[in-house]
Amino acid sequence: MTEKKEFGRSGNRDGSEQRNDRNNRSYGERREDRGSSFHNGKRDDRGSSFRGGKRDDRRSNFHDGQRDDRRNYSHDGREDARNNYERDGKFSRGDSDTFKGKTGFKGDAGKPKFDRKQREHAGGEKRPRTAANLDPRQIALETLLDVSVREAYAQLALEKRLKQSRLDARDTAFITRMVYGTIERRITLDYQLDQIIEHDGEIEPVIREILRMGAYQILYMDRVPDMAAVNESVQLTRKMKMGYLAGFVNGILRNLIRKKDELVWPKPEENPARYLSIMFSAPVEFAEMLIDEFGEHEALEILKFRPQKNYESIRPNLLRCDEARLRRLLNDDEFEYESGKVDGTLRVYNAGDMTKLRAYANGLFAIQGESSVLAARAVEAKPGQTILDACAAPGGKTAVISEMMQDTGRVYAWDTHAHRVRLIKGTAERLHIENIRPAMRDAAIERPTMQETLDAAIIDAPCSGSGVIGNKPDLKYRISREAVQSLCKTQQAILNAVSDMVKKGGTLVYSTCSIFKDENEQQIRSFLSTHPDFYVESITSLLPDDLKEHETPYGLQLFAHRDDMDGFYICKMKKMDFVSVK
């Protein structure tokens, strides 16, 4: 088999292959720059940077996103003669939890087409629609309801809906952008709709999401004609068996088209947190937390950041493929790529869904963000050791550690949910790694029988996910002071339990994908104050030159907007070997 064929698309097209990690994934071209002027009234026809797949590099209680991409929307421009009317429906409006405008409409908180050569690898023609398939906008709506009403994670909800739908790449890309664009701008859309709706009361969640979707297309998707957005929204209302509200939806969206240039935006000097909340669609409390910790300017930079170029971060599975071979495979299929900031990683631009490539299915490479790779390498695992990945799913960091150990010794990989343990197993099987021992275990529980049995452990702790909101926009609606306080207690319990399992002279790495000190530096300060047998060890030798200056005596804090990597915290600690102390 030639290398080119090995890198081609695999025959598995049902999406059953789970992505092994979760970092810098971005589909579509970048969004509009929302610079310091904060002008947010411009349409956004340049895609977005949400990235998908199940990935390990952004572990959080709030994870799971999927990527999105641009699509040629010209076929959506058809007019429906049945909808050639306009009236303002009388309907009650929904309670929500973010803003109260004069009308009370308060916010509650794909994959791109492969290029020609990649489509050839896929084989076969476009899969025909079946009776089981829904209209793309209906799938997007159901996914949004999964997230806003059923409190599902966007990534998981979207993956499930797309797998059931069996749509082609074009519709998949459209659905993904619609879902993530609407989630990303939820509060902003509600604020805009708030200025149009003139009715009090409660709005059904279905209608609220249809209005958000319609407003997103009208205000931020230039390739969808305004009237097509209206007509499709009206039809969607009918498909959801709520035709009696079709006139209401029609009237609101038509009024939005007429008045979109007259929308009023808040002024930053009046209420900075509310301003950031509306302009960048973040809950007020989250905006306040950012301002309190980083100041207004830095909070703005954190909320507005989007990658300049969208890419997929990958690394070779060193047990089966070196970097030189991976580069040859990419060259053969004419991928655009460059070296990542972290040694041994590559950034592949306009990558498409790389989980469909045969080389991925054969375990030649892993999709994993550079911050995640860096955290795993901080363990500095050696062959023959016994190591614990305490919060391992779906196994990206576990795999890096196993590769450093040359598939010898033993790596315990724990997670608290059976389905996440299955992801770890899937990652190990795909990468052909044999020294991983997945198990459903709660790392916060003390285990006297394992005391001082580990050469090293890594805790990629459950966290707020505040460092990766650009890729997983649904996470920001879950962030609050109360949530962070609860997470800190969990993190502390895991640190206490796992540290007892580390041998004297052993290594303990703590990481999160958060940017809040309470979850990071303060957590380590507190831990060290009660565990004097541990001390922080520098990881400067592992860092790219431009990151070395950011390491502190209490670890390394990465920021997406500053460092061009996922927001991450990494702290390496060593347990003192008292025997060697004189």
Q: Where are the model-predicted features located?
A:
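S-adenosylmethionine
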Residues: 1-582
